[in-house]
Amino acid sequence: MALRTLASKNALSFALGGAARPSAESARGVTTVALPDLSYDFGALEPVISGEIMRLHHQKNHATYVVNYNKALEQIDDVVVKGDDSAVVQLQGAIKFNGGGHVNHSIFWKNLKPISEGGGEPPHGKLGWAIDEDFGSFEALVKRMNAEGAALQGSGWVWLALDKEAKKVSVETTANQDPLVTKGASLVPLLGIDVWEHAYYLQYKNVRPDYLNNIWKVMNWKYAGEVYENVLA
């Protein structure tokens, strides 16, 4: 049983970049994750993001990552106990993809905030100063992230990252559902923008730049600032 629990926790830690965040444990001792609740209604981000997109994105897309990730955890739990190393290696792809999808979307929901509650208000305080220092201005950061997101081939994410060792902020991109930690162990996500088509196609069709330009109106910079200050505290 101890080996099973350890294997599951190690797999979860891999996807989360070294910090396991269990939500529940089954009777077998397998650590699983759960779909997080949103702090706002599906339609609260309109007209920037439609309620239909938010409902499908959360209830279907993210929920599927959770189901498939938990399934992969159960499977790797079994093959580790059996000592089947080749099966463990084969499951890493499913764990990375679905675990990354869960991690990335859990951050994404926190990065969004209704306009009526302060969404879109530019960053202030220490994060605002860091952005000015590392990018020249807030407007320059937005332009850079929009350009990186528009240029990203296929599906993926564009991130505002904090390098906790260098104490610098940077723009990073990751393919598919790769979490930011795959670009460097010292990188902490402050903001992530989902540029998979499921995040915008029903509303913006194939015009990804329009989606990128508009999403800043519902960005939760208060959350990003809190993460920044907590990491560097």
Curated annotation (Swiss-Prot):
Top enzyme category: oxidoreductase
Keyword Manganese in annotation: yes
Cofactor: Mn(2+)
Protein keywords: Manganese, Metal-binding, Mitochondrion, Oxidoreductase, Transit peptide
Annotated organelle transit peptide span: 1-29
Top-level taxon: Eukaryota
EC assignment: 1.15.1.1
Tissue: Predominantly expressed in the embryo late in embryogenesis.
Co-factor binding details: Binds 1 Mn(2+) ion per subunit.
InterPro entries assigned to the protein according to its UniProt record, in alphabetical order: Fe/Mn_Superoxide_Dismutase, Mn/Fe_SOD, Mn/Fe_SOD_BS, Mn/Fe_SOD_C, Mn/Fe_SOD_N, Mn/Fe_SOD_N_sf, SOD_C_sf
GO terms for biological process, alphabetical: response to abscisic acid; response to osmotic stress
Subunit structure of this chain's protein: Homotetramer.
Protein's job: Destroys superoxide anion radicals which are normally produced within the cells and which are toxic to biological systems.
UniProt xrefs under PROSITE patterns: SOD_MN (PS00088)
Official protein name in the record: Superoxide dismutase [Mn] 3.3, mitochondrial
Binding site for Mn(2+): 57, 105, 194, 198
Family in the record: Belongs to the iron/manganese superoxide dismutase family.
Main location, first listed in the record: mitochondrion
Recorded GO CC terms: mitochondrial matrix; mitochondrion
Annotated catalysed reactions: 2 superoxide + 2 H(+) = H2O2 + O2
Pfam families membership: Sod_Fe_C (PF02777), Sod_Fe_N (PF00081)
Subcellular localization: Mitochondrion matrix
